[in-house]
């Protein structure tokens, strides 16, 4: 069975954000506005996305 994936795009800057939020973006593989990553759809990834939801958007599930 194929694993479910989720595509995420960074829409906001990490400048003047707390270190934990910047680290979460790095953990998601994002570091510049406009970058997209396809990630495995797991509860831990969903939690990371929720933590920085003001800086990322879900492109497709």
From Swiss-Prot:
It comes from the Bacteria. GO terms for molecular function: structural constituent of ribosome. It holds the Pfam family Ribosomal_L30. One of its GO terms (cellular component) is cytosolic large ribosomal subunit. GO terms for biological process: translation. Keywords: Ribonucleoprotein, Ribosomal protein. InterPro entries: Ribo_uL30_ferredoxin-like_sf, Ribosomal_uL30_bac-type, Ribosomal_uL30_ferredoxin-like. The keyword Ribonucleoprotein applies. Belongs to the universal ribosomal protein uL30 family. Part of the 50S ribosomal subunit. HAMAP family: Ribosomal_uL30_B. PANTHER family: LARGE RIBOSOMAL SUBUNIT PROTEIN UL30M, MITOCHONDRIAL RIBOSOMAL PROTEIN L30. This is Large ribosomal subunit protein uL30. The gene is rpmD.
